[in-house]
Structure formats: structure tokens, C-alpha cells
Amino acid sequence: MLIRTPHITARSSLDYSKAGGLFCCHLRRPPKQIATNIMIHWNGSTEQARANAFAMPLLHLAERVTVLTVIDGQDVPGPSADQVRKQLRYNGIAAELVSIEREGHSTGEAVLAAARAEGCDLLIKGAFTRNRLRQTIFGGATSYIMQHAEVPLFMAH
């Protein structure tokens, strides 16, 4: 599913269950190139693993792939970033690992800052790891990233 819009929010009516993956980019700033420098925001979740699986054709095209972890971020029990890198290598994709500190920022802010710093042209993100009630009350990385990303997003739930 391709969405070109200035803003998509957590409360929008997108049905993630019907899409293999969801690609979003800003209507006002369409990318000149895409999927040459991809960042995967790894948090150990099933949603992130699905996003990676759906994005595999794009990952094969990339010149550079970075697996990002946020220390003290919103991780859940699951495979480590190193295990993800090994799985990517098994599929013929070279990837580097980057870990960052939140440094007083939210996980979403830290992820977008890292994507900017690495010059990424696509961010792969598992969408809405937290349940809907927690997401509504406390917010989350997905909502923040969807509202503030300047880089195209590829997401799956």
C-alpha cells in the first residue's frame, strides 16, 4: 500500500492488517531516491520482524543497510540486533549495527535523529508494538515518527 500524505497519525483509519507493508512519504517533499540507504529500527518486536520480512526486496536493492537499536528505548523481548544482522547476511544483505542513547529524548525523536545523521532515505519500522490503549494514553515511537518523519517510512503491524 502506498500513502503519500503530509501527516498520518496513529488514529488514522489505515487498516494495517490488509497491507503487507505500508510505504509513506511526504506529499510536499517526495524523495529523489529511495531505498539506497535503509535504516531498520530494531526493537525486538514481532511487528518489526514483519516489517523486515515485507521489506526484503527493498533491502536487497540497498547500497547500505543499518540496524539501529535505541538503548533504554521501547524494546520488547525478541531477537537481538546481532541476530537480525546474521539473518540479513544469510539472505545476502550486508548490514551494520548502530546503537544510540536516547539522551533525554523520546525513542521516536532518537530514531529520527539517527536516520537524519546517517543520511537514510528509508526507515523500516514495526508499527504499534504497544496496545491501542497504551498508545492512546502514553503515545509511542510509531505515532511520533509518523507525525514528524522527513524520511520515507516502510511499516508493518
Specify the residue positions occupied by each region the protein language model found.
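Loop/helix-junction capping segments adjacent to catalytic residues or to phosphate/diphosphate-binding pockets
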Residues: 6, 32, 46-49, 74-78, ...
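Short, solvent-exposed coil/turn elements at secondary-structure transition points
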Residues: 29, 71, 101-103
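Short, well-ordered secondary-structure micro-motifs
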Residues: 36, 51, 76-80, 108-110, ...
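Redox- and metal-dependent alpha/beta enzyme cores, enriched for Fe-S-associated oxidoreductases
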Residues: 44-98
